[in-house]
């Protein structure tokens, strides 16, 4: 789980305007941070299958948001991919 400060920091970094908390970019950035933390957890706790299922659900949710953004605005999609270093 993300603490308030870390979540606010991510929102401030990726927001499009002053009151933005729910744009696809912000949602993708928050999901990426949660995915990274959960991945570290699963490397230590290999048999935690309940958390692994949650990880797969989050990855799918992020993938759906990325697909939406790619269809809606390819430039914003490319920017978020580069900023978060998601593709090789």
Swiss-Prot record:
SUPFAM superfamilies: S15/NS1 RNA-binding domain. Pfam families: Ribosomal_S15. GO terms for biological process: translation. InterPro entries: Ribosomal_uS15 (IPR000589), Ribosomal_uS15_bac-type (IPR005290), uS15_NS1_RNA-bd_sf (IPR009068). One of its GO terms (molecular function) is structural constituent of ribosome. Keywords: Ribonucleoprotein, Ribosomal protein, RNA-binding, rRNA-binding. Belongs to the universal ribosomal protein uS15 family. One of the primary rRNA binding proteins, it binds directly to 16S rRNA where it helps nucleate assembly of the platform of the 30S subunit by binding and bridging several RNA helices of the 16S rRNA. Part of the 30S ribosomal subunit. Forms a bridge to the 50S subunit in the 70S ribosome, contacting the 23S rRNA. This is Small ribosomal subunit protein uS15. It comes from Caldanaerobacter subterraneus subsp. tengcongensis (strain DSM 15242 / JCM 11007 / NBRC 100824 / MB4) (Thermoanaerobacter tengcongensis). The lineage of its organism: Bacteria, Bacillati, Bacillota, Clostridia, Thermoanaerobacterales. The gene is rpsO.
């Amino acid at each position: 789980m993300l603490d308030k400060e870390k979540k606010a920091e991510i929102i401030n970094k990726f927001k499009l305007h002053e009151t933005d908390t729910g744009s696809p970019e912000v949602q993708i950035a928050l999901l990426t941070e949660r995915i990274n933390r959960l991945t570290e957890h699963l490397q230590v706790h290999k048999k935690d299958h309940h958390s692994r299922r949650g990880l797969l659900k989050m990855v799918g949710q992020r993938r759906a948001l990325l697909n939406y953004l790619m269809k809606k605005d390819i430039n914003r999609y490319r920017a978020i991919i580069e900023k978060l270093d998601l593709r090789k």
